[in-house]
Structures are given as C-alpha cells and as structure tokens.
C-alpha cells in the first residue's frame, strides 16, 4: 500500500518564470530519483507526478514548473495550507561508489531531482545543467554546495556554455576519468547520454520523464520501451540502467 500524507506547506516560492520551489512537512524518507504524486486541488481529479528535489529532517522539497491547470493551482497555495501527497514512489538512483568522478547531467525540469543525488553520491561530483535561457537557470547555488564543479549550458547562449550539455559531457570524458553518469531530462538528451557513455563503457543511469496518470501502476499512461517490451515507468522506473531503456 502506497503511503498518503496530508502535509503542511512551509514554502511555495516563485524562483523563476513559471518555476516554483515548495517545501512541506513530510514524515518519510526518500531515495534520490523517487517522486511524489500531488493532488493539486480544485476539480483536478488526477494527481501530478513531481520529482523529489530533497528529503531530509522531516522536510520534503520539490521544484516544479507550471504546465497546466493542476500545477497552476498548486502554485497558488500558500504556507500553512495542506497538500495531499502520495509517496515516495518509484525506483531511485544507484549511489554506489564507482572509480572516477560522478557526473550528474540534467536538462530543464530534469535538473531538479539531481540535487539530492549529488548530495548523496560518494567521491567527486560534477554537475552539468542545461536551460533554455538565463532567466530559467535555477538551483545553481544549491548545486555549487554539493558538486565540486558545476557547468551551465543555455540554448541561446545567454549564460554559460552556448550549446548542449552533452558537449560538456564529452569534454569531461576526454579530459579525465569518469566513473558514472546519471541523467534526467528530455528524451533526445537521454538518448545522446546513453550513446556517449556506452561508447566509453561508463556506468550510466537515466531517469525517464513520462506523463503519468495513477502513479502506482494501475493505468498504462506512463509506458515506455525496455528491451522491446512495454513497461510502466512508475513501477519499473523512473530510473533505469541506460542499457535497459530503448531510446
């Protein structure tokens, strides 16, 4: 039985255009890469899956982008209000030691769940994060605390590297020993990361961003392909070993 909690909102801050940073009281622990299913209120019947940014000391933090009616309603909530949360759900990242530096690489909303992962990984961690433009760059200070190195890329060149996060990944792999790569973001980015790491024999895990319905495996909204078969991301994922994800 999945755990449901009525949680008190502590913060719901607008940190960039359309992006909010929420913290709530939460009684459970979570693993990096897991997510929660949030009932946003109003007449929205389905919950919204949101990746966990941090979870420690009885506090759950998630950063989310307003993309529809549900998250729009969520963005209007204020401290002191209750929010109905199901979770934590899904399978998280493998945080075991690998010889060489760890690289966490994210694009867009795929950046947010990597903060807790970067905090928990052993050894040196390099973070590579991609955004559309400078005004959407978030969590840079947070990552600078838990990563020994951080790199930012923007699509339009208004901040950091002008280009793809995978450009930076290739440079890192060519200049030093990379032990493991952990990625979350859009499918084209994940596909490129899978190809690059496979070519160099580097351990890689990918977190799939799929639209979800129930979040507990009862529907088939979040299916993806793994070794030619349909699998439910909410049950088998959202984190997969790269070789297990057909992208």
Predicted features and spans:
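FNR/FR-type flavoprotein reductase catalytic core
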Residues: 72-209
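Short microdomains enriched in Cys/His and/or Lys/Arg
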Residues: 238-247
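Structural signal for conserved beta-strand scaffold positions within catalytic alpha/beta enzyme cores
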Residues: 11, 54, 152-154, 206, ...
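Ferredoxin-reductase
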Residues: 2-79
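Short, Lys/Arg- and Gly-enriched loop/turn segments at beta-strand edges
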Residues: 44-52, 90-97, 234
